[in-house]
């Protein structure tokens, strides 16, 4: 009989949230995955809620890296994958990985093996970086979900996939064309349509509509 020698993990991911599960699935035997109450040896990746990072980091000083894009903890390096995790291994080729502090070279390579593209992010720019990420991800989702809720409230039930195909097509166009991929009345300077659309919206959506529409003027 042929015996298989178990592979010793190169590092341990602490936290079984969506990020921890996704990275563990992608790295396979290279990474262990434990609940955040565990105290493993070796290099530890803190994949825990932001509010828990500072306290846990004290238990692994000098041998941990956290994933929180919003936090800078002096002496605790950060590797923040600029993506939205769902707990599954995905194709992350070309996804930025923001590095702040002395992330070990081996861990940089491990992220690179998954397709992430590392870049150095100064600590003082993390709040701006994180705000840009929230605008792109959380706020974009809020706009889409809010727009569908506005329609449902007036009895408009869109068939099929609702507004999602429009959102996907818009992202494809902007990815391919940059600012030239933008369309709509604000791009055309159609003030009559802008006024009618704004009048149809309740607050705060009316103000959001007008502010965002003119934000790139």
Predicted regions and their residues:
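NAD(P)+-binding Rossmann beta1-loop-alpha1 motif at the extreme N-terminus of oxidoreductases
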Residues: 1-40
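Conserved beta-strand segments of alpha/beta enzyme cores
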Residues: 30-32, 63, 75, 117
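Internal alpha-helical scaffold of NAD(P)-dependent oxidoreductase catalytic cores
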Residues: 90-175, 215
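Interdomain hinge/lid region at the active-site interface
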Residues: 168-217
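Predominantly flavin-linked oxidoreductase catalytic cores and closely associated redox partners
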Residues: 82-87, 91, 102-104, 179-187
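Rossmann-like NAD(P)(H) cofactor-binding subdomain of soluble oxidoreductases
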Residues: 20-21, 25, 37-92
């Amino acid at each position: 009989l042929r015996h298989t020698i178990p592979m010793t993990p190169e590092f341990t991911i602490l936290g079984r949230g969506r990020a921890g599960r996704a990275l563990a699935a992608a790295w396979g035997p290279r990474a262990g995955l434990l609940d955040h109450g565990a105290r493993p040896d070796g290099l530890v990746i803190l994949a825990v809620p932001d509010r828990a990072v500072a306290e846990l980091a004290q238990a692994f000083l000098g041998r941990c890296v956290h994933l929180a894009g919003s936090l800078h903890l002096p002496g605790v390096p950060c590797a923040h994958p600029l993506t939205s995790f769902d707990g599954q291994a995905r194709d992350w080729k070309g996804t930025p990985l923001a590095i702040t502090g002395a992330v070990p070279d081996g861990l940089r390579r491990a992220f690179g093996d998954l397709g992430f593209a590392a870049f150095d992010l100064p600590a003082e720019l993390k709040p701006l970086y994180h705000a840009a990420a929230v605008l792109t991800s959380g706020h974009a989702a809020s706009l889409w979900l809010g727009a569908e809720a506005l329609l449902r409230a007036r009895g408009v039930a869109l068939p099929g996939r609702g507004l999602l195909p429009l959102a996907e097509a818009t992202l494809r166009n902007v990815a391919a064309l940059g600012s030239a991929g933008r369309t709509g009345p604000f791009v055309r300077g159609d003030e009559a349509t802008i006024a009618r659309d704004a009048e149809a919206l309740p607050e705060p959506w009316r103000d959001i509509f007008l502010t965002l529409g003119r934000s790139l003027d």
